[in-house]
Design a protein with these regions (language model features):
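FIC/Doc superfamily catalytic core
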Residues: 1-184, 188-300
Length: 300
């Protein structure tokens, strides 16, 4: 599919990897479970970190999967992690049941995001005007929000079959950020809604990395000036990264383990999209099949 706002070669690469991914379906329950677990941790950590949450990747895992409390971290940061995991499960269930997206679903997602954090605002459009720090765009006044969200849903249903999934997901994300319908949680809401679109269409969730936070905000600013190319290419690369992670996991599962033997985690980083720190953490916590030889973790 040709596109004026995303690099054509990038879009073709994404769609090619999606076809390759579809060829592996149905996924084995073990692989599907492990990928869901890894993406839930990474997605939760990065999306919250972009908004200023100081929980590390490992701490996020301890909070959402083991129910632990982290010293010197705020209660709000704990709830942000817990709530985000709950929303992700909500999205997976929503997709599995093939439900239809509407404003009530958006409000239900937001209610979970701010649960035990700002209960009075959770699941409600804002009734006050807001500013986005460092942005060139001033969000619309609160009185316009209901009408704008109604138009947003009309736009979505008009364009969902006309655009590529990558473009549709990118536009949904950008338009929600632009409207800024909530008093808090707009960034997380936009990224979750983008991923709901991807999941509904058989894509893995796209994780915008905290290390790319500055670039992320920069391309959003450019989009506010109606310069969309860098923004959509940024979103496209995030989607492609997730596809690569899925494909590498599925291909590794299909290969005979004794064909390769054990390799170091440093070598493994060249075969996947994860860094040495994250692979080491997965090995230590038993989420990555690995053995320790002397002082070094080795994996297949």
């Amino acid at each position: 599919m040709e596109s004026d706002i995303i690099n054509t070669n990038l879009l073709k690469s994404i769609e090619g990897k999606k076809r390759e991914l579809d060829a592996f379906r149905p996924f084995s329950p073990e692989i599907a479970r492990k990928l869901d677990e890894q993406f839930t941790i990474e997605w939760t950590y990065n999306s919250n970190a972009i908004e200023g949450n100081t929980l590390t990747l490992q701490e996020t895992d301890l909070v959402i999967n083991r129910g632990l409390t982290i010293g010197n971290k705020t209660l709000k940061e704990h709830f942000e992690a817990i709530n985000h995991k709950e929303v992700i499960q909500f999205l997976y269930d929503f997709v599995k049941k093939k439900k239809t997206l509407d404003e009530n679903v958006i409000l239900a997602i937001h209610k979970i995001i701010l649960k035990n954090i700002r209960d009075m605002d959770a699941g409600h459009y804002r009734n006050a005007n807001v500013m986005i720090m460092g942005a060139v765009h001033l969000p619309p006044s609160a009185i316009k929000i209901p009408k704008l969200m109604e138009e947003f849903m009309e736009w979505y249903y008009e364009h969902k079959s006309k655009l590529s999934i990558v473009e549709l997901a990118g536009w949904v994300h950008y338009k929600l950020v632009y409207i800024h319908p909530f008093i808090d949680g707009n960034g997380r809401m936009a990224r979750l809604l983008m991923n709901l679109i991807l999941l509904q269409n058989g894509y893995p969730p796209a994780v915008i990395l905290n290390i790319d936070r500055r670039k992320y905000y920069q391309v959003l600013k450019e989009a506010d000036r109606e310069q969309y190319n860098n923004y959509f290419n940024f979103i496209g690369r995030s989607i492609e990264r997730s596809l690569l992670i899925y494909l590498n996991a599925l291909k590794s599962k299909n290969d005979k383990e004794d064909r390769y033997g054990y390799i170091s985690l440093q070598e493994a980083t060249k075969l996947c999209e994860y860094g040495i720190e994250y692979l080491s953490y997965l090995a230590r916590t038993g989420r990555l099949k690995a053995i320790k030889i002397r002082r070094n973790w080795m994996t297949t």
